[in-house]
Amino acid sequence: RDCCTPPKKCKDRRCKPLKCCA
């Protein structure tokens, strides 16, 4: 959840692999 909103968190290691960050 937190990884996708806001998308800025996609820079995080654990968030990067998520589809919402691709």
From Swiss-Prot:
One of its GO terms (molecular function) is toxin activity. The modification Alanine amide is found at A22. It is found in: Secreted. Belongs to the conotoxin M superfamily. The keyword Chaperone does not apply. Keywords: Amidation, Disulfide bond, Hydroxylation, Ion channel impairing toxin, Neurotoxin, Secreted, Toxin, Voltage-gated sodium channel impairing toxin. GO terms for cellular component: extracellular region. Expressed by the venom duct. Negative results: does not show activity when tested (1 uM) on rNav1.2/SCN2A, hNav1.5/SCN7A, hNav1.7/SCN9A and hNav1.8/ SCN10A. The lineage of its organism: Eukaryota, Metazoa, Spiralia, Lophotrochozoa, Mollusca. Disulfide bonds join C3-C15, C4-C20, C10-C21. Its main location: secreted. InterPro entries: Conotoxin_mu-typ. The cysteine framework is III (CC-C-C-CC). This is Mu-conotoxin GIIIC.
